[in-house]
Amino acid sequence: MKLKAFHKLSYGLYLIASENKGRKVGYIANTVFQVTSDPAQLAISCHKNNKTTQVILDSGIFSVSVLKKEVNMKIIGDFGFMSSSDLDKFNGINTITAKTGAPIVLDSSVAWFDCKVVSSVDLGSHYLIIGAVLDSDEISDEEPLTYQHYREKYKMLSPKNSPTYIDKSILDAETSIIPKKELKEEQDHAPIFDGKSWVCVICGYTYDPEEGDPTVGILPGTRFEDVPQDYRCPVCNAAKEYFQEV
């Protein structure tokens, strides 16, 4: 079975949030989909080890914020790769309170849904949670973020708790057996640059010397070896020492 085939399935990227007894929690998800129109219901897939999952089950409420294509990567880093036990993810985040009482994240979002849990299914490592949509709103007409764009632009890996997680070593092995003709076609279209790429071992973000990191003043063409020692991953804030050459 070739696992890269799963990358052909289409997903968006969403921020799931909930609250119980004054405790706000949230995480980044790519498995949110509408299951019925009347009544309007959404389904989300939540890993059992996520703190947010238990809060959703206990409170019976959750919100879904649809992230925009040009998302603030700090939101991805905090909500996607940090634990709610270790960090107040909502500090400095623009939110409103939904009818259900769930927090709704407005930053980097194009739409939101307020949901009440109506059922859940134990899938082993995950729960499939069905929520009735009690309210929704469109924030802007900007293009929503897709998982394909996220993966290709930021060269990111899915977190281990994601339903779509695939071990990088398996993907690398599958890539190594691509027919030579296909590899040559990819190489023919690839930009010519002799710099080395470096991957954050925490979140999978790839530093590409050809692009640099203009957000912190690192110009295109800057080798990772020449990046300042206090450089940190723009996604998960990991130190430079957590990057490995690929």
What role is predicted for each listed range?
Residues 1-191:
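Basic, polyanion-binding surface patches
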Residues 16-18, 196-201:
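A short beta-strand micro-motif
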Residues 194-196, 229-230:
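Short metal-coordination and nucleic-acid-contact micro-motifs, chiefly zinc-binding Cys/His arrays
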Residues 200-203, 233-236:
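Short cysteine-rich clusters marking metal-coordination/redox-active sites
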Residues 204-209, 227:
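Cys/His-rich short segments
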Residues 209-210, 241-245:
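Short, non-ligating residues that shape and space the ligands of small metal-coordination modules
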Residues 215-230:
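Short linker/helix segments within small regulatory modules
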Residues 225, 238-241:
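Cys/His-rich finger/ribbon microdomains and the adjacent scaffold used
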